[in-house]
Amino acid sequence: MMTHQTIGGVTQTVCAVFGIEDGAAQIEDAFAPVVAHARSLGIERCERVLLYAPDAIGFHVCQAFPEVIGPVAQRASLIVQMKSVVPPVTPVCFATMFTGQPPAVHGIRRYEKPVLRCETLFDRLVSAGKRVAIVAVKDSSIDRLFRNRPVDYFSEPYDPEVTETTLQLVMADRHDFVLSYHQEYDDILHRTTPRAEEAIGAMQRHVASFVRLAQGVERSWGSRHRMLGFVPDHGGHIDPDTGKGTHGIDTPEDMDMQHFYGLFRGEYVLGRHR
C-alpha cells in the first residue's frame, strides 16, 4: 500500500468538515478526498459527525472478507487508504488519531493509558463550541486517554451497551460529535487468529453495529449536514511463536489501513436547514 498519510489525519479531517481553523503546526493534514467530497456536495460545514472506531480491523482482513465489510461501504462509500503508526498498539494509535500528532509529540510510544496533556481533537471541538460525547468500553484506551475535558463520557461494560448508548445519544440529538468504540474483534484476535471464524464473527457484529448507527444517524440527523466514519486503528498478524493473533510491529498486516466515510447533505425544511 503506497500512501504517505497515517491515521493521524482523522483529527484535521473532522475539524475541516466542521469548518474549524487549523490547530498545532505539527498536526497531520486532513484526508483531502473527504474534504473535497464534502465541498462537492455543497457542504461547507457539517453540523453533526459520528465516528465509529472498531479495534484492529485492518486493510488486509477487509480485503480477505469483502462480503463482511461490504455493508460498511454501502453506508460510507468514500474509502481512504492510510497507514497506522509505529508501534501499532491501541493507545498509541488512538492518541495519534485523535490528536493529529505523531507519538514523538503526543508522548505515548508503548502500551500505556495516561491521560493526554497535549491538545486533542476533543479540545478543539469544545473550543469551537461543539458538544462532544465519547462512548467506549470501560477502561479501554479511548475511555481513559482523553479524560479531564469538558465532554460527556459514557463508560460501558462491553460493545452491546456501547451501541445502545450511542444510538440513544444520536436519537436525542444533543451532541454535535459522537465517538463510539468497540473492541470484541481485537479481543478475539488475541485468543485465536485475525481470520479465525470466531474473530470474523466479531467483525460481522461490528459491521452490524455500524449499520444500526448509520440508520440512527439517518433518522435523527437527516435534516443536518453530517459525516459518518468507520475508523479502525490498526490491523493484526499471526505471531509465529504462539500461533495466535497479535499486533505491534511494522508489518503490512498491522500497518495497512482503510477508513470509510459517508457525507450527506441535510434535507431542507421550509427552504432552510433546521
Short names for language-model regions:
Residues 1-274:
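Feature captures the catalytic ectodomains and active-site-proximal regions of enzymes
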